């Protein structure tokens, strides 16, 4: 409360909610302000039952990735951007990548010993790091890069290389998919695809590199690079309208890809598709009318070791309050 005019700012709000867009009343006695309770509920679409159910106790977390053997999981808390590892059932929680600014997008190495992730510092471009999965000091993958965002790391099946997307720098609209040899730090580039791409995903058998076509700031299709033929192929043509094609994940056998996209009428309500790597027509896996996504990147989705879709549901609230000022 304001009991008398003050020459210094006075805090009006407290607690876990975030407050925004304050507007004073005409008589100056009140302030109308929007309060946001930002949190999510992790849910899984059970493909056998066709029902949505809480996952890992419904924690508020996203960016999940499971170890290759399916025994462990890494995720980012929401809000807060803290990386945690745990057993598959959510027990034995341990923080990794401490003292980072905003770590997210974690990926287990094939042998489970390391985790690659992206950190968004307060200033400067995003950076890719690798950290021991049991905790330790993160090591930057491309320490010489100072101009471009490094995003979406993906492991080669043998764990010796990382592929990542280098986003457009200021004044440059091109993107690059780089492959880094982790023992030598030598960098190679994938051949330029027909369309600009982002979000690489190495197939489990190592033959393919999947990428999302990127007509910045939107993503609208899928392309795949065949390391055997050394050629790109368009797997899914552009999806017109919003939302974009997002968050592709390989099936365990490497024969198909799960992704989130719009329905036939270009509406977004939690639609998950699967498409085979040979380019057959996409199959609708989950259709969730009324689903409201949450998370730092809003419409994240992944799959669990049994290939059930997992998503973060918006469990927060938005209210408008009137704060009376005591003069």
Identify what each model region corresponds to:
Residues 1, 39-43, 80-84, 123-129, ...:
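Structural motif
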Residues 2, 7-10, 29-33, 40-47, ...:
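An edge-strand/N-cap motif at the start of beta-rich repeat modules
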Residues 2-7, 46-50, 87-91, 132-136, ...:
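Short loop/turn segments that connect beta-strands within beta-propeller blades
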Residues 10, 53, 93-94, 139, ...:
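A structural motif specific to WD40 beta-propellers
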Residues 11-34, 54-76, 97-119, 143-167, ...:
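Conserved beta-propeller blade repeats
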Residues 18, 38, 48, 60, ...:
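A generic "binding-loop/recognition-motif" signal
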